[in-house]
């Protein structure tokens, strides 16, 4: 009887696992990106302002 049943539970478990992995991956990438942006925000801002000022003259 269990062999005739469709494998609904493993598919459901795999879907949950996949969604968890994707969520964790997105969270890690966003955290790393946020920390990097915050760390280099002042440097990027200064260099961008200097570049725009030099090219506006």
Swiss-Prot record:
It is found in: Virion membrane; Host cell membrane. It is a single-pass membrane protein. Keywords: Host cell membrane, Host membrane, Host-virus interaction, Inhibition of host NF-kappa-B by virus, Membrane, Transmembrane, Transmembrane helix, Virion. GO terms for biological process: symbiont-mediated suppression of host NF-kappaB cascade. InterPro entries: SH. The keyword Kinase does not apply. Its main location: virion. It comes from the Viruses. Residues 30-57 are intravirion. Pfam families: SH. GO terms for cellular component: host cell plasma membrane; membrane; virion membrane. The chain crosses the membrane at residues 9-29. Belongs to the rubulavirus small hydrophobic protein family. Interacts with host TNFRSF1A, RIPK1 and IRAK1; these interactions interfere with host NF-kappa-B activation at the level of receptor complexes. Interacts with host protein UBQLN4. Plays a role in the inhibition of the host NF-kappa-B pathway. This inhibition occurs at the receptor level, by preventing the signaling of TNFR1 as well as IL-1R and TLR3. This is Small hydrophobic protein.
């Amino acid at each position: 009887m269990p062999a005739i049943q469709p494998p609904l539970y493993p598919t459901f478990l795999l879907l949950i696992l996949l969604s968890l992995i994707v969520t964790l991956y997105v969270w890690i990438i966003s955290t790393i990106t946020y920390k990097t942006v915050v760390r280099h925000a002042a440097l990027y801002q200064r260099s961008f302002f200097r570049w725009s000022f030099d090219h506006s003259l």
